[in-house]
Amino acid sequence: MNNNNNNNNNSNNNNNSNNNNNGNSNNNFFSGKGNALSAYQNKILNIKSNNNNAHHFVNKNVPTYSPPNIIMANKKGGNFNNTSGNIINRYNVENNNHRNTYHPSNNNTRNSVNFLNKNILYGNNNNNNNNNNNINITNISNNNNNINITNISNNNNNINITNISNNNKQPISSNQHPYQQKQSHHHNNSINYNEYMDEKNMNTSQSIFKNMTIQRNSQQFNTSDFVNNINIMNAPHINEHSNIYKRNSLNIVNNAHIISNNMNIQSNRNSNISFPQNMNANIGGLKNSNHNLNNIEMKYNTLNNNMNSINKNTNITNVGTLNIQMKNNPMNVNINQNNYNTDFYVNENKVNSKNKENNNNHINIEKMNYIKSNVYLDNTLVQVNSNNNYNMDKNILNNNNNTYIINDKKNSTVNNNITNMDNNLVPGVMSSMNIPDDIKKRKKKERKKNENIYNNRNKSSINTEEHNNNIIDVANQNSEHFLQNNKQYGNITNIQNNNLSHDMNNYSINNSTTSDVIGIVELYKNSLSSKAVNKKKSKLIKDVIDDNKKRNKKEKKKTIPNNDSIINDMNKNKNVELLNETQIFDNKNYDKNNDIHNNIYNSNDNNLIHNKNNVNNDHTNIKEANNNNNRKSEHSEKNKDVHNYYYANNYQCITDEKNNKQYILWNNRTIEVTFVWLFITKEFNENRKKYTAFLPYLKHFYPNRLKDLIEQLEKYSLLKFNYIMHSSYNMQEEYNKNKEPNNINSNDNNNKNDDNNNNNNKNVDGNNNNNNNINSNDKEVLMNGMLLSDKSTLNSNKQIDNTLINNINSGFNNIIKNMSIDDNTIRSIMDNIENITKGKKKGRKKKQTLENNGDNIKEDIKSSKKDKKKDNINDNNNDNNNDNNNDNNNDNNNDNNNDNNNDNNNNNNNNNNNNNNNNNNNHNNHNDNKNNQGDSKNEQEKKKKTRQYRKKSKITNDDNNEKIKQDNINSNNPKNDLKNNEIICSEEKNMKEDNIPDDTHYKEKRRNTFNLFNLDEGTINMDLFNLSLLENDDALNKKENDMVSKSNIPSSFSSPPKETNNKNDIDKEQSDKHNNVQEFQNLNMNNEKSKDLYFNKNDIDNNDNKDKIINETSSGTFMQNLKETFYEKTKAMFSNLLSDTKISKDDELNNEVDQNCVKTSSGILNKEENNKKEDDEKHFDDNTNEQKKNVDNGEYNEMTAEPGRKKRKKDVLERKKKNLNKEIIKSEKRIRKYRTKKMLLKEAMEKGISNNIVESNITANNNNDNNKNNDNDNNNNNNDNIINNNNNNGDMFSNSYDNSYIKENKYNKKLCFPQNNLLSDFRSEPIIIQQDKRKIIKINTINKIKRKYKKFRFCINKVFKKKSINDIIALNENIHKNKDLLTLFKKKDLANLKKKNLSFFMDTLKLEKIDMLIMKRIQMCLEKIKNTLLLTCTINNVQEIVNILKKAFEKRLYLMWPLIEFSNKYRLDQYFHLLGKNKNHINSSFKDTKLFVHQNISSLILYFNQRSMDDKWVEYLKSQMKPKRRRRKTKMKEQFLEDKPIDYLNTMNSQHSNNFIGENFSEIETVESKANEYAFVGYNQKRLLTQITPYDYRVVLNSNFCNKFFTPNWREQQSIFIDNLHFDMVPDTDEIKKHFENVYIRYMEYDEEKLRSKSDTKSKEHKKKDKKYKMLFKKKEGKGKPGRKKKIKLEIENVSNEIKIKKPRKKYERVKPRKSKNAMMNEEKSGNSEKQINNVLNVTNIENKHKSKKGRKPKESNLNNLNINEDINVAKASPDTLHRASLEFMNPNLFT
């Protein structure tokens, strides 16, 4: 799709645009951003960015989502071969760095197109019209000035020039009409279209525009160009576009698509066009179209500059209208832009295959009849009426000889009724035609009368036989507005129902652009003077217009994203039932109606409401309004609350079971789903910023929810369905040309993976591994004519297969996870527990709050069930068993046909597939043959089923499915039709699914995880999220070890046969109860061990029980698996960790007395025998807990020892049984009595990392039966857990499991364990690691240190109650490195942490230096494999892997970098300053943003105020502690201890509550400035403001965003990596310090000049003041007091920096109060100088007001003024410097 555009300059005849389409080069016109142009389009559009500022145009005023105008006009039928890429109508140049100068063809045309980030519409440049003449060129002039979008239709009939000015600058002046300006006026910026249509090549027309100049702020055209030179209909033949547009002649499309950032659409000017007499025949139906058109003179008599602006809500107030004057015809009015805006693409209509009414087609056809050149034939044309339209296309294309394109055909329409315009819904724009309620309520007579008139008109104007396409909208009963002419009625039918709710008020339900509708109204108003129209009608129209105005006023507040609610309202109220509904169209391809193109295209797709509800009526059948309405109402009821996007009904999903592929039938084309994903991937990869909002969710769409994804893209105006399909089709065509027969399967697969990667890549590299690979391999994957080579050809081509790369990457991540001995176990499980319990609550709430509209859910459920069965197809038919086994199991998962599954010759696969199929049948059989309609019957069946299953267990799959389906409301029926397993995102495929046996439950679960995200809310159903993650982690774990398997390692790897044999053996034996045994676990052990530990032999041997199992669990598979994997593990852990095992033992004695009494006693009695073994394997506790330890040891044995295993044990048991029970009861009582939270925490700490926990996790899927027969020692650990788990399938924290009381259980949820890697991903399951003595030693040392330093425990309690990330990080850092334990919480360590300056690392990121690190890591991985799996692996192409990993890391890191920057706690404040106080500055980039940031520093002010008071108090007390010698003895002296301190304290404390009134009031400014500074730079660490450290990186890794987006393994690996990052800060040079000070001064709004002058004069002033100050105190103090003087001197030195602490007056110090002469002046002066930065308090210095209370110091006011003037906090800054400083702080490299 990306063309080698630069090569197209020379090729004038691009008949086969396909040839050029796939020369994918990064030189692409868009520089990798935006939608690629087809070769053809590149020829057509020569766009050069003349404006230097273009790339600086950061998305300032631009709405978040920009509508790409994607118009696909590719049709295979007829002469229309241009299948390839007319795709690019819009491109976002989002990178500042990309300035695209693009002039592929002979520099003839240069569009100065400045890219507003998201809003630029590059007109509909898909000129697939064989109608040669129209290319929509939207010239958007840059920056804020004017967006002049001139779409001038070649058709003489309409030249609508819309001038859009973004920043409200004046558009074209009214006196100078743009067409009358001459070419001499061209400016440098202007676009000169001097191209001629080559007359040789353009058979149809001579030259359309000779000279056209689009200027930045005005449009200049030569009138002659339009009037004289448009001979559109003369030519007998329309050749293909390449001939037509030879030399890139730019035909400017008629109606401008108006998009401006602010959605200010200014100007459909009112222009009067006078037409010759010939045109009056049929309004818009020009039967003699050739001749007439030649004679048409376009005279613009007036250009009324009614630039009517559209609000951001796209309410059009008054858009000027074309008054077209047709002589002899009073109803000139009816020829509105419809007739003349011939450019419109028939495109959108067809989007709905069912849409047989072609309102748009009619319009198009009409235009075709009289304006041949402008009709854009789209692919979709064929689809509108699969039969009729196709004929139309053929006729249009082939039968060009006829004067009328489809003159003799049924389909030809001569009808230019305005009703035909009404096909496009433009949401957000209020149609003036909306019928006010009062009109609706009119008397029956009037209404009937109107209806009769209307019906008559329809009869007269429609010849049903001849003009089948002449569908005149038969209006709804209540909404007929039509005007009567002597001869004809121009129909303006507003097909709204009475029910039009006020939500919908803004939306023109006529499918015409609102401007058109308003124009029509204006036209009608003009024609009202004709006597044919009576007063009532004029009043009616007037009412309509008034109502429109009112509604527009109301709707101003509405924001664009209300489309959903609007759509829902429309559907509920059946408001949007257009009779000739061609509503289902692409928002961006405003092809269907000229109208859409004509006047307004709102930069948000939201303007166009996509209605699935459109009933498709054949053109031939023109039914009465009632029939259509009925059908529509039915349909709308079916789809009631679904977000109806047009594409829903427009394609069919076809499954090719033989080839295991899935196809989409669209516009009579079959598109393989793979290519759809490929295209989406490419699009996302090229426009990451654009799709940023989607990033967290993409991977949840990936294999099965293509439809959901497209719908979401539609909904948020990011991509259009037609565009996607069209592009995908082109891609597929290109690929088919180049492909080799053996490449197909792998390419599809790889591409699918790539797609997903790219999806996730969008902004933050999505699924870690996937995105990395795609990014690194973009060229290979997407840009070569041949997509990635097949696996089988890997060796010969020496290409790295993308899947393999992903496997390598993910595999290494997983192994690294295994490798990191830092224990994630407890942490992860605790977090999971916490999240799951929380998540359940959240999930329930969400269930209620979601838009659970019944039909919607029905459809979702049906579609999801149905899709489980039908649509999941294996796209990879590699015969290689390993490949199938590993890569394709999941692809096959949900096929019900065993044939597909049998392709995989592995027994394991067959078994699992059978299970899956049975499950699917059982679960979904009632949905097999149903369509996407939500029948109540199905709903009832579903309810019945769910009820049944709910009875069986508390948590069942059906519950979850239901919840998930409800959560997945965004996935409507149609979405789920596209569910494909064939494309598996590489990460998911490799990490989650590849090696998992085909398991419907797993698949279902995985799908459910995709549905976890509610895009509307942007939230996750945490319940489902966590549950699914657990099992995904099983899959990941399996993947970790399977990474060694053949399919996952490139052929260049040599993998020893031992490994695969081991795997296959295990596979044969392995079939877990619910098909979810993890190969990972199996591979971790020897065959013996794995047999003993991991297999339920009954399940393996008794396949007879399979059906029974399936029937029992088919509804509950998801949750049951969860119970087995997660609950057992966590319960087992908690039994070891949190409750003294005696309690759980006691409970079990109660529950299973017979079995366990024997076991317990025998275990304890034989404790000594087993002690050694027990200690080695399990106990890391210290000697302090001996008694408990003994009980624990006994307990492990007691549970696991088998009765009758050793006779000696039985004998001992009988002897000692009584004693044992007594002992147990005693210890239990003791423990219960004294247990506290501290004890719980202590126990958790002490037992936290014991390998008991890790090993108990291994036993997740085991049952008692399994272990009874095994003598393996490992079972000693397991039975304990398993028995417990069997008893408790319910709540994890149920008291039946451990007797600990409820408080404890609540507390359990909160516990965190510092031994774990606290920052590692909490979702990851514990990793099974062989016993490691080093770990035991480490734990013991920690325990010793804990005992030694009580501070440690205290801090842990404190830290984890607070969950302060800083403390946790410090704790984590220190615990992982035992040497740091002694200085555990010293500030120095925190400082050291922060000194690891990651920003420095980023700047000097030399990836070569990382090579050694990665290689070392790989070596460790291999050792780990050897230790755990007993396999030796050799890697031959290490360098290749290193490069892959490096690229992956680099791209990820750079994607995460903005997050990391933002996470910097100092950096957050600078965003406040940028968005807060600097926002109103002249130069601010954020002036127009709606973001408001409020920094609440009131608490800081209070704090500093209190601190200053405390300082005073302390100072006072100090002075009291050293009594002073007094000059004279006084009887007035008061006792120090009695009154004074208390009084003083009271006064000080009261000041606080009185809003600082009192002595302290004068210091508010100082306090405030301190608070400000503190807020600006936390803890005054100015230097750190610009530093980003590994600490920030770690915080980001642990953020929700990364949790959703990156795999746990990768994040964990990164956290390990971070531990090794010790980049010390760059030392500060004088230059850096100086620079920083300058920036800081500007930032804090200090005036640099004043500060400089102050610093110059400072020393002199100080000397003066010092003298005065000393003298002052000498007077006070009297005779020599040397000590006192020294003290004063110290104070003086700091006088300008510190708060001056006023000591309280002594009563005996009498100072006469006298008024200061300068008091008033000082007040004013200080008041002006002390306005504070955040304007919390602007106070004058009232200090003097309070002087009289306590006397005065001589000259004190001057001292205060000195402080104020010299205090850096008080100084002022100029706004310019402030703004500059703010921007500088955005630069992370400031000091590195």
From Swiss-Prot:
GO terms for cellular component: nucleus. It comes from the Eukaryota. The keyword Ribosomal protein does not apply. The keyword ATP-binding does not apply. Residues 856-873, 955-966, 1060-1071, 1088-1106, 1166-1192 have a biased composition (Basic and acidic residues). Residues 169-182 have a biased composition (Polar residues). This is Uncharacterized protein MAL13P1.304. Possible candidate for an effective malaria vaccine as determined by epitope response in sera. Residues 1-28, 741-776, 874-924, 1045-1057, 1261-1289 have a biased composition (Low complexity). Keywords: Merozoite. Residues 1-34, 162-187, 440-461, 544-568, 736-777, 837-979, 1044-1071, 1084-1106, 1160-1215, 1257-1290, 1651-1686, 1704-1731, 1742-1761 are annotated as: Disordered. It comes from Plasmodium falciparum (isolate 3D7). Residues 550-559, 838-847, 943-954, 1205-1215, 1660-1686, 1704-1717 have a biased composition (Basic residues).
